[in-house]
Structure formats: C-alpha cells, structure tokens
Amino acid sequence: MILIIYAHPYPHHSHANKRMLEQARTLEGVEIRSLYQLYPDFNIDIAAEQEALSRADLIVWQHPMQWYSIPPLLKLWIDKVLSHGWAYGHGGKALHGKYLLWAVTTGGGESHFEIGAHPGFDVLSQPLQATAIYCGLNWLPPFAMHCTFICDDETLEGQARHYKQRLLEWQEAHHG
C-alpha cells in the first residue's frame, strides 16, 4: 500500500499538489492523509498515524517547499509519530524495510535549486534522507515539480501524470 502524507498549509491555493493527488487517487492501493485537514489544531493522533504507517509499503511525504524546508505540521508529525522505540532506537523497527519518497512542489525553476547561489536538492534533502535512514527506511530519489506558480495547466497536468507514473512503477516493481 502507498501512503501519502500530504502537508499543505493552504491546499485550496495549490493547483500542483491538487493535480498530483488527483492522479495518485486513480491508482489502487493508495491512501492519502491530509495533515492540515486532519489536524488543524496540530494535535496529532499518534496512534492513528502509526497504524497507517504500519499498513504502508511506500510512504510519500508530499508538500510544497517552504523556505527550503518542510511545512511546520509535517515537521511536528515527524517529531511526534516517528517516536523512539517505535520508529528508531531500542525496539524501534516498525518502519524497517519500507520505502520513502519525497514529493515536493516548488515555485522556483529547477535551475534555482542547482549548486551555485542556492543549495541543490541533494543538500535540501539531507535532513529528510537522514531521518529515513535512521528509521530504517529505503530512501528513493525525490520527485520534484518545479515552477508551479507559472506553469500552465497542460504542464502541471503532465508533471502530475509523471508523478502517478513514478508511483505506478514502484507498485509494479514491488508487487508485480
């Protein structure tokens, strides 16, 4: 099962993430948990989140890039849900062997994230990648949808279909 942990503080403003979710929903075996819809008060149901994670084979952290990082509720979710003794540390093997895909949207162009004036995605992904490895997750190459503020509908739809294809390819490779 693919579990998408969706963290967008303003989902009604996002054309890119909306299209990505619409494409993902067309696949079988996909569950979407919209953190800002489930927890507008930031009071996370840790047991429910851990139960959802336990059913997943592939976990996707999907969100817009915010100041080269993740939205605050996703950070809190990671801090609370990926707890010692469950996700890491003594006895913390609940996520071992599962896969993690970072699916991120950006307002800037791809060249904005190349080495130079701004850090590249290899650098930006390091905290998430380190978290994944620490919890025994297999880190997959990230999916990034760039230029979401200026893309036309056709481009956004094409990139969303590419996202669906990434998920489908993972399903086929791991579940035949």
Swiss-Prot record:
This protein's cofactor list reads: FMN
Domain of life the protein comes from: Bacteria
Looking at the keywords, is NAD present?
yes
| Reaction catalyzed | a quinone + NADH + H(+) = a quinol + NAD(+); a quinone + NADPH + H(+) = a quinol + NADP(+)
Q: Name one GO molecular function term.
A: electron transfer activity
Compartments where found: Cell inner membrane
Instruction: Name a single GO biological process.
Output: positive regulation of potassium ion transmembrane transport
Q: Which residues cross the membrane?
A: none
This protein's membrane topology, according to the annotation, is: Peripheral membrane protein
| This protein's record includes keyword rRNA-binding | no
Quote the record's binding site residues for FMN. 8, 14-17, 65-68, 105-108
InterPro entries, per database record: Flavodoxin_fold, Flavoprotein-like_sf, K_H_efflux_KefF, KefG/KefF
Q: Which Pfam families match?
A: Flavodoxin_2
* EC number(s) on file: 1.6.5.2
* Keywords carried by this UniProt record: Cell inner membrane, Cell membrane, Flavoprotein, FMN, Membrane, NAD, Oxidoreductase
Record GO cellular component, one term: plasma membrane
Q: Give the record's subunit note.
A: Homodimer. Interacts with KefC.
Which PANTHER family does the record cross-reference, listed alphabetically?
GLUTATHIONE-REGULATED POTASSIUM-EFFLUX SYSTEM ANCILLARY PROTEIN KEFF, GLUTATHIONE-REGULATED POTASSIUM-EFFLUX SYSTEM ANCILLARY PROTEIN KEFG
The UniProt function text for this chain reads: Regulatory subunit of a potassium efflux system that confers protection against electrophiles. Required for full activity of KefC. Shows redox enzymatic activity, but this enzymatic activity is not required for activation of KefC.
- According to its UniProt record, which protein family does this protein belong to? Belongs to the NAD(P)H dehydrogenase (quinone) family. KefF subfamily.
Q: What's this protein's name?
A: Glutathione-regulated potassium-efflux system ancillary protein KefF
According to its UniProt entry, this protein's organism is Shigella sonnei (strain Ss046)
